[in-house]
Design a protein with these regions (language model features):
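Acidic/glycine-rich phosphate/pyrophosphate-binding loops and surrounding catalytic core
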Residues: 1-212, 217, 226-234, 239-242, ...
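Short secondary-structure boundary segments
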Residues: 221-222, 245, 267-268
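Cys/His-rich Zn2+-binding cysteine-cluster or related metal-binding knuckle/ribbon modules and their
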Residues: 249
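Active-site loop ensemble at the mouth of alpha/beta enzyme cores that anchors a bound cofactor
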Residues: 278-283
Length: 283
């Protein structure tokens, strides 16, 4: 399995390949090869900055001679008008790395900003905000890093690091008890130590999951606030609980106040708006 650094290197290589192709002919035709310059990253709206470390890797991978002065680090609140970094390099390098760096930082900062709003919304409760697998193909590690920078927590990274029995698994497997039993048989056969979470859609499934046992967390899928409170009381701390499905910024605190341990929010990565910023020449 590829490491995070290897996945990010592949992403950077692919992004440069699709953007530059056989050459940035606009830059090559009008900028002298050895011309030097300086650009700064300007924040154009308030938010949480994210992607600084990955941006540094973009610059270093394209041109190791690029000099980056970081003024604001990942996870820091920024205001409109703040300068996050200054980069001194060949002008050709500045121009050819500009868009990829901005695409990464705007996306990651947008995710971190939205995540932070949800986290702040839950202050005073015990509930943690989780992301989901509803990420942009190829960008999952980047987007999940941004969630953590914004103060959220990562759910499973992929299909390999946790067992999550969802409705389709349960239905195809012939029910909750069969699904959990097969999980344990599989994990024992493969010598794997993975946590098991199961999704339940109603109180009958909740009762069956609890009676069966052998699980770490129960996901309450599309439960109302009232039913969530009832379910949490029934679970009584025997298993971790997670709310998921149809939860919005306006309703998330109501669910948290039911006492769930986690709330997963797909909107953190699938419906986010990038944070506005620019990379402009400076003195």
């Amino acid at each position: 399995m590829l490491s995070v650094n290897e996945l990010e290197d592949r992403l950077i290589d692919l992004a440069f390949a699709e953007d530059i192709g056989d050459g940035d002919h606009t830059t090559l035709c009008c900028i002298p090869e050895n011309a030097m310059g300086k650009s700064h990253l300007l924040n154009k709206e308030d938010g949480i900055l994210a992607g600084v470390e990955l941006a540094k890797r973009v610059f270093a991978k394209f041109d190791p001679t690029m000099q980056v002065e970081v003024l604001i680090n990942d996870g820091t609140p920024v205001k409109k008008g703040d300068i996050a970094m200054v980069v001194t390099a060949k002008v050709r390098s500045l121009l050819q790395t500009e868009r990829l760096m901005l695409n990464i930082m705007q996306r990651m900062s947008g995710i971190a900003t939205m995540t932070n709003k949800y986290v702040e919304r839950l202050k005073g409760t015990k509930t943690h905000v989780l992301d989901t697998r509803k990420t942009t193909p190829g960008l999952r590690m980047l987007e999940k890093q941004a969630v953590k920078i914004g103060g959220g927590m990562n759910h499973r990274i992929g299909l390999f690091d946790m067992i999550l029995l969802k409705d389709n698994h349960i239905d195809f497997c012939g029910g909750i008890t069969n699904a959990i039993t097969r999980c344990h048989e599989y994990l024992k056969e493969k010598g794997l130590d993975l946590k098991i979470e199961i999704e339940v859609r109603n109180f009958d499934e909740l009762a069956e999951a609890m009676n069966c046992g052998g699980i770490n967390r129960i996901m309450l899928d599309n439960f109302s606030v009232a039913d969530t409170k009832k379910a949490v009381d029934i679970v009584g701390g025997k298993f971790e609980t997670e709310s998921s499905g149809g939860i919005t910024f306006d309703t998330i605190r109501d669910y948290a106040e039911c006492g769930v341990d986690f709330i997963s929010v797909g909107a953190l990565t699938h419906s986010v708006k990038g944070l506005d910023m620019s990379f402009k020449a400076c003195e």
